[in-house]
Amino acid sequence: MDSTGRAYDGASEFKSVLVTEGTSHYTPVEVYNILDELKTIKITSTIAEQSVVSRTPIPLSKIGLSDVKKLFDINVIKCGSSLRIVDEPQVTFIVSYAKDIYDKFMCIEHDSAYEPSLTMHRVRVIYSMLNDYCAKMISEVPYESSFVGELPVKSVTLNKLGDRNMDALAEHLLFEQDVVNAQRENRIFYQRKSAPAVPVTFGDDLEPAVRERANLYHRYSVPYHQIELALHALANDLLSIQYCHPTVVYNYLSSRAPNFLRLDDQVSLKLTSAGIGTLMPRPVVQLLDYDLVYMSPLALNNLASRLLRKISLHLVMQMVTAVQQDLGEVVSVSSNVTNPASACLVRMNVQGVQTLAVFIAQSMLNPNISYGMLSGLTLDCFSNFIYGACLMLFQALIPPSALTARQRLDINNRFAYFLIKCHATQATTASVVPNQVIYPVDAIDQWQSNRRDVLVAIYNNLLPGELVLSNLIQTYFRGNTAQQAAEILIPADQTSYGANETRALSAPYLFGAPINMLAPDARLSTYKRDLALPDRSPILITTVEGQNSISIEILRHKTGLIRAMYLNGFVTQPPAWIRNANSNTALLSRFLDVTPNLLGIYEAILANTYANAVNVYCDSVYRADIPTEWKLHQSVDPQDLLFGVFGIVPQYQILNEAVPDFFAGGEDILILQLIRAVYDTLSNKLGRNPADIFHLDEVFKVIEEIVSVLVQQKVDARKYFTESMRSGSFSKPRWDNFLRRPVAQRLPNLDSVIMTQADHVYNYMTQLTHIIPITDCFYIVKNSGFVDRGSTGPVMASSSVYENVLKVVHTIADFEAANALRLQRRSVDNTSYTDSLSDMFNGLRSISSSEFVRSVNGRSVFTEGRIDAIKVNMRVKFDLQFITEEGGYSKPPNVKKLMFSDFLSFLDSHKSDYRPPLLTVPITIGLNNLGETNSNTLRMRSEAIDEYFSSYVGAQILVPINVVDTRVYTEFSELRNFFTGDVVITDDPFDVWDGVKATYIPIGVHGVRLDPNGDQPPL
């Protein structure tokens, strides 16, 4: 139809258009009144849609240097003494682990002390850290012009860095000259300098004008430890694998356009004219394990839905009234006369033809997503010549996979029943019935419940003179012998439905090819192979010799069979419709004459599949092991072909919009591969199968969180492993089957690199465990505490003690051993009980609190020299608190302590736990900042001061002071050396284009020919 609404090539004036919306599975049906026969077929595909897959699983963001989270805290004190005045107190910088930084990875706040649980937790957290740290690229460092002597320099502006303002820290130094010198050295240390090299290696072959160069970057020395900058530095790697210059995108899109498409001119100009520093999401070459989609009902259902949305068929048809009028003249009856011929006149279903065409198209695109349920398939269905003829033609239009094996078997048996009833000689019937080859014609129940192929059995037991029956069956089986028809193509144990796929169940369909040897549409195979794309194509719907030619042989074979069935006479009593029914035979003759009209369906399908041939959801391989309940089912009525035969106008110009998805449709496949990859990662880290250690719910929770990060959407992994598309319950056998399957294809490079990156972060973080507040053991004592009021050292008091003053008298191996001691109870008297752990504790030697506080020189000294202790080998976390002691002593500090009774309560609360949580042990350290005061009060050995420091004494569960990882610097240069790291950033931030839509436009017209040698021979 042209833009004015008239048909082409002299056809009559356009009369009406019937548009049926229905559901998304249906497309508009165009209805015309066509008088002239058209000779030319031209099919074009109009494609204009975003057709490239580019993903940024870890999208990058920009932050300033001051936004970098700090791993270390700095405390500044001036150490004095409680026994004497110190004229020049030592300025000391204490560097300690900062709370809330990387704590999720280190399990500071929560998690089990059980080592595998800790490992799995850390693997999970790593991926959130990729977003929290590695995806945040430092893009701004404040700097200013200054001088070092007479030399002009660009120094980092320290006063914009908060508590990392090294100039402010230098002001704590005792002497003014030291302050000035330190600040001058800061300007020398923290400078902007030329970058030694390009930090971001994109690895693309770019033109020199748009290639990254070192002179576009600068290196900044900043007051951060390299550990604090390390994760942010990984952003460069994430940038290079997820982004590229627009010219790379242009080359990618141009090389991947099939020969009927080219990139839109405006898009091409925009991409090729992009300057240096411009980036786009990098196109992803996804060489995925496409067969995985057939292991998950959800993935298969999603793929089927996408496929159905891509079917766009425009069938050109005559007006229903015109067809009815024409046929009424043929059969010489009016529409109110009741017989099969007149009945068919009122049964012209336009929408039914469209439904059948869409069903045929989806069966060609992928034989594994759906199946048809034939309506009207009764035992005596072939006695209705309209139904029988339409069913035979329907077989010629569909691959065998379009129907279930059970339905195909039923068709064979219904055909066998018709042959025995109408065409078999009396001698044949007398031969095969007694030998139980078939059932008697009147044994209706046995025929209907039969589960064997009776047609093959008849074929194999025909009498030598039974030519009519032999020819009919041989024609039906496409010339195959009885032995060939009985050949098993797929054994029953390799099918989900437990039935043998024989050649007899494939031969009557399409080209007669076996169900496991359906020919793929190879028109675009060279294009796909050149790009290393998967060689997945729809089922070929044309002849193998002419890949864009539809052969009339498809239908000629079936029309010959229909003539033999209904018009060449009957050996036995004919069906009722034959008697005195000239109108019926006239209708059938006309029906067979115009059967080539059905090629119009193939024209529309071929136009659609040409574009779809590059899509990943296409497949020509039938997979018998896919459960039937996973597939979509659709009710189809073969009699709907009736209007298709009489009403479709073939050889008509079809303007068809068919948009290829290219890689789209592989999302679920990628998710399934990521699920497997994450599961394997957990297995490697744990050293065994995670399901052997944890409940599957725990494992899936970790898998889902990681995969959700990588695909940037919420993923419910369990939904991929159910019994069917309509079942929401998880199937353990499906999951086990998924794990047993060998990994056939590695992850796309993008995801593989990101997972490798995550592994690097994991290994890097585990190397930092020495600074985190977790230790492998703790001690139980009767009393503890430490006071050193007379020292000029940084630690003045503590709620714990040093490990060298502990005398281990008992060792408890682990939580289970401690729990067992607690459960070993015995009666003390008639009213009380004790347990072995309490007995062990009560046996420890007790030290008076006064020994921890009062001494001649202000330092704790014990009469016995050491403290009896029980060592418990359990992972615990410690909560470190600093109190700055400046000599006021006005109010005793609130020092947290853990008592033995608290430990007993912990055991009682978790006695049934296989994996207990971490016990938290508080440690409080009083820092010596007495150099800030000149008060004489602090040197008085009063009981009030002793009482003040007794607040530090009394803890019974402790982690030794020396376990706490702190760094003490008395020289400012040492502090500066510790906090010196390098950042290399671009002078001009990257310009990222996220909203560019890559569109294709068609090139030329691609024709589909009916029999390339010219005119069609009559049927």
UniProtKB/Swiss-Prot annotation:
<keyword id="KW-1152">Outer capsid protein</keyword>
<comment type="subunit">
    <text>Homodimer. Homomultimer.</text>
</comment>
<dbReference type="InterPro" id="IPR015312">
    <property type="entry name" value="Innr_layr_core_VP3_Phytoreovir"/>
</dbReference>
<dbReference type="GO" id="GO:0039624">
    <property type="term" value="C:viral outer capsid"/>
</dbReference>
<dbReference type="GO" id="GO:0030430">
    <property type="term" value="C:host cell cytoplasm"/>
</dbReference>
<comment type="function">
    <text>Capsid protein which self-assembles to form the inner icosahedral capsid with a T=2 symmetry, and consisting of 60 P3 dimers.</text>
</comment>
<protein>
    <recommendedName>
        <fullName>Outer capsid protein P3</fullName>
    </recommendedName>
</protein>
<comment type="similarity">
    <text>Belongs to the phytoreovirus inner capsid protein P3 family.</text>
</comment>
<dbReference type="GO" id="GO:0005198">
    <property type="term" value="F:structural molecule activity"/>
</dbReference>
<keyword id="KW-0167">Capsid protein</keyword>
<dbReference type="Pfam" id="PF09231">
    <property type="entry name" value="RDV-p3"/>
</dbReference>
<dbReference type="InterPro" id="IPR016029">
    <property type="entry name" value="Inner_layer_core_VP3_Reovir"/>
</dbReference>
<keyword id="KW-0946">Virion</keyword>
<keyword id="KW-1035">Host cytoplasm</keyword>
